[in-house]
Amino acid sequence: SDGMTPTKRALELQPVIRDVLSKLESSIQPETDFNPATSSRTFRIMTSDYAESTLLLELLGRLADCAPNITLDLITPSDVTFHDVEQGKVDMAINRFDELPLSFHQKVIWYDNFACVMHRSHPLASHYDLETYLKAQHIWVSKTGFGVGVGIDPNEVQKLGWVDAELTKLGKQRDIRVFTRHYHAALQIAKRQSLIATLPSKAAKIFTDDPDIVLREPPFDIPPIALKMAWSALLHHDAGHIWLRRLIGDVAAEMQ
C-alpha cells in the first residue's frame, strides 16, 4: 500500500531544500571501501506489500549469493515520512508515487500492467468480458491502505485506485466485497472464494504455477503503474548505496 505523500508545506519548500542538498551532495566524496561479500551493513527500505511480494523477494535471493551478511530492514509507508528518507535515516523508498519532493533522486524500476486473478472454477474463467466482470464480486487492494474502515463510502472507492478510476471513465462501477491493503491476502481470498482480484501483473503471477488459479487480462484498459525507488541526495554518492541501487536494477531487469 502507498502511505507517503508530501504535505503542501513540503512541496513549497522543495526549491530551497533542493539547493541546500545539492550543495551538500557536491561536498560528499564517494566511498571506496564497500565490499558486499564481507559487509554486514543494514539497509533500511521503506516499501509496499507489492514490492515486497515481487522485487524484494528476488532481491533476497541475490543477496544470499553475493552479500550474505547484508541485512534488509523493510519498513511500511505508515512507519516513516519523506523527511526520514530525505535525512538519510531510511536508505530508500520503493513504491508507486504520484509525486515526490524535488530534493530526492529517483529511478523507475519497472512499469507493470494489470491482471485479473480468479479460481479456475469461477464462471468468469470461461465467459469473460466487461459485462460479466462487472457482475462478479471483487477484492479491492487499497492504494493507500485506507478503506471503509476509516469512513470512506464504498460507493466512492473509484476515486482511490487505478482500476476503479478507469471504470469510472467508462461510467461503470464494480461490486467490491472485500477491502484489504495486502496483495497476498487478495490472492489467497481469490483462490478460496468466488471473488476476483485485479492486481499488478507481477503480483498476480505469484500464482502462475498454481493449477487452481486462472489469470486474465482486464476487459478494459488500465494504464501501467510505475514502481520507483527514491533516495536522499545525502546518500547518492555512498558506495554501498550505489551498489544496492545497481543490484536492484539488475534484479528488476531479470524480472521483465
Model-derived features: positions:
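Short amphipathic alpha-helical coupling segments at ligand-binding clamshell hinges
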Residues: 9-16, 55, 59, 129-133, ...
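Secondary-structure junction motif
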Residues: 124-128, 134-170, 238-239, 245
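A late-sequence structural motif
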Residues: 131, 141, 213-256
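Hydrophobic hinge/microswitch elements
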Residues: 78-81, 86-90, 152-213
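Ligand-binding "clamshell"
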Residues: 100-113, 194, 207-217
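Acidic, Gly/Pro-rich loop/turn segments at junctions of secondary structure
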Residues: 66, 78-136, 145-146
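Alpha-helical "hinge/linker" immediately C-terminal to small N-terminal DNA-binding modules
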Residues: 5-34, 40
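Central regulatory/effector-binding core of bacterial HTH transcription factors
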Residues: 40-100, 180
